[in-house]
């Protein structure tokens, strides 16, 4: 599983529609993620930030994540901008530190 944090900014039209309708975007997001084996872990609005929303989700692989991004962001039309960050569990980072000694590398020199 991969864990992703996605921050996104709605278009002005989408923000207006959400506030006027009271639409539950969290449920809409779940409907895209869950059929692909993913899980919405958290969803937050962000006040005073460039981005309007932030969500943390898990996916079986990057393929399913990219499919959701393509459908919801590139094809959806309601998102003006976004930033994706892959979250790495600290256990994975610790495991990587144990492998470092096995890697051959020579840094460039002047």
Can you annotate each of these PLM segments?
Residues 1-35, 39-51, 62-67, 88-110:
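Short S/T/G/P-rich N-terminal loop/turn motif that feeds into the first structured element of a domain
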Residues 6-8, 55, 82-84:
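A structural signal for short, well-ordered beta-strand segments
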Residues 52-58:
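Short cationic amphipathic helices and targeting signals
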Residues 58-90:
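An amphipathic, aromatic/His-enriched active-site/gating alpha helix that lines ligand/cofactor pockets
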């Amino acid at each position: 599983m991969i864990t992703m944090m996605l921050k996104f900014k709605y278009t002005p039209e989408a923000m207006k529609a959400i506030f006027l309708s009271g639409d539950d975007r969290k449920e809409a997001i779940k409907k895209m993620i869950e059929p692909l084996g993913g899980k919405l872990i958290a969803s937050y609005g962000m006040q005073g930030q460039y981005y309007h929303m932030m969500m943390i989700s898990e996916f079986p692989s990057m393929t399913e994540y990219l499919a959701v991004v393509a459908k919801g962001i590139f094809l959806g039309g309601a998102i003006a901008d976004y930033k994706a960050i892959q979250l790495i569990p600290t256990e994975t980072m610790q495991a990587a530190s144990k492998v470092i000694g096995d890697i051959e590398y020579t840094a460039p020199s002047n």
